[in-house]
Regions:
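Short, Gly/Pro- and small/polar-rich lid/capping loops
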Residues: 1-24
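Catalytic core of soluble alpha/beta enzymes
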Residues: 201, 211, 218-391
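Mobile "lid/hinge" segments at catalytic clefts and subdomain interfaces of large enzymes
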Residues: 49, 142-205
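Short beta-strand elements
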Residues: 14, 24-32, 36-42, 149-171, ...
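Metal- or metallocofactor-binding catalytic centers and their adjacent structured scaffolds
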Residues: 41-130, 134, 181, 209
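Glycine/serine-rich anion-binding loops at beta->alpha junctions
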Residues: 16-18, 101-119, 147-159, 204-205
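Glycine/threonine-rich beta-strand-loop-alpha-helix active-site module
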Residues: 129-148
Length: 391
């Protein structure tokens, strides 16, 4: 082992995410001066089984400060990691897991472990003089993922828990990023003009998407279809339409309360039927409450020729939950978020299992994200089919 790769210094500090909330930044330096820096993102819509953030719950920053997390790094974790080779990511992450001893990082915090794990990965890539997208890359092809970009927002991203969370578009045909971004620009601006004309423009949601008032999911999808058509493109053939339902956010005691209307899983399925058959929706994420895997499987069985059923809260980037979903034939794609499980190693294990079973992986940002560009590197390095981001 090269002694120059040994971790010598771990620094941590409070920084702020895109919502202005405190989060954790970590820097790791090796003996020869190689370093990695990472910031932990934060989600507004979180799954029951994802890693828990450590917050202070005091008077500072509305209880969201991270001094406890910084103290855990400085006093509990850093002494265990200093002297370890940055190239040994598995051992690095296993130390974090062993210090925590829970599936949800209840003791050290998912925000703590995420920042540390990514910082070490970046430190190792710098030590090897390779960009992160090439370090431990699964392929030498460097294929860019298809971007899935938000046009409309709702749900937890817009303070409206009784609506679908994201309405997005993605390229079906091959096109350059420049061509696609131009389409996103034109579709978004066309949709905004329609909202303003009809007094339906309320503002923007957490991730930059349009936030309408007095419009339901059907009306929003109609606007997206019209806006795509105005770009002289065919919805559902050249540009795909996707929805993140985040159904757990409007579920309670067996009832889905959507726009103040109470529905069961069967009635919710009828809504998806119309969205798929008449409004060109070809990807639906978290269509049911995250513990109702049977409804996921039924929807997947009924519509798998027409639409991808995506698990986010259902899976939480956890190997064990994905294995169960595969056995139940519940999904054809999954969302990947590093801070849901809290380490690079656990994330890679989940991606590997997905690919072994022909499950597509969609690497996703969080609504409280940061200026950290690491996500883009990993989308390429790990061969993710898509990357999901805000506007």
């Amino acid at each position: 082992m090269n002694s120059d790769s040994l971790i010598e210094v771990i620094n941590c500090r409070r920084v702020f995410d895109s919502r202005g909330n405190p989060t954790i930044e970590v820097e790791i330096f090796t003996k020869n001066g190689s370093y990695g820096r990472a910031i932990s993102p934060s989600g507004a819509s979180t799954g029951l089984n994802e890693a828990i953030e450590i917050r202070d719950n005091d008077e500072m920053f509305g209880g969201k400060d991270v001094k406890k997390g910084l103290e855990i790094i400085n006093k509990k974790i850093a002494p265990q990691l200093v002297g370890l080779s940055c190239e040994n990511q598995n051992e690095f992450d296993n130390i974090l897991k062993n210090l925590d001893k829970s599936d949800q990082k209840l003791n050290i915090g998912g925000n703590v472990s995420t920042a540390l794990s990514i910082a070490n990965y970046l430190c190792a890539s710098n030590f090897n003089k390779e960009p992160a997208y090439k370090y431990h890359c699964n392929s030498n092809k460097n294929i860019l993922p298809r971007p899935e970009i938000q046009i409309f927002g709702g749900g937890a991203h817009a303070g409206n828990s009784k609506s679908f969370q994201d309405f997005l578009i993605y390229p079906i045909n091959n096109m350059t990023y420049e061509e696609y971004f131009n389409i996103v620009f034109n579709v978004s601006n066309s949709a905004k003009k329609k909202l303003i004309k009809n007094n339906n423009f309320f503002g923007y949601c957490d991730e930059g998407g349009l936030y309408p008032n007095d419009l339901n999911h059907f009306q929003i999808c109609e606007i997206i279809n019209e806006s795509i058509t105005e770009c002289k493109l065919v919805p559902g053939k050249e540009i795909g339409i996707s929805i993140d339902v985040a159904a757990s956010n409007f579920y309670k005691d067996g009832i889905y309360t959507l726009y103040d209307k109470e529905l069961d899983a069967s009635e919710l399925t009828n809504i998806y039927d119309k969205l798929i058959k008449t409004l060109n929706v070809s990807l639906i994420e978290d269509p049911f409450q995250e513990e109702d895997i049977i409804s996921f499987a039924n929807l997947q069985s009924q519509y798998n020729q027409f639409v991808s059923i995506v698990g986010d809260d259902l899976i939480c980037t956890r190997h064990d939950l994905l294995k169960n979903a595969i056995n139940q034939k519940a999904v054809s794609a999954i969302i990947i978020k590093i801070n849901q499980c809290g380490t690079i190693t656990e994330t890679l294990e989940t991606i590997k299992l997905a690919k072994q079973n022909n499950i597509k992986t969609i690497l996703s940002a969080r609504s409280g994200d940061t200026e950290d560009s690491f996500l883009s590197h990993l989308a390429i390095a790990w061969g993710n089919e898509m990357i999901k981001v805000g506007s």
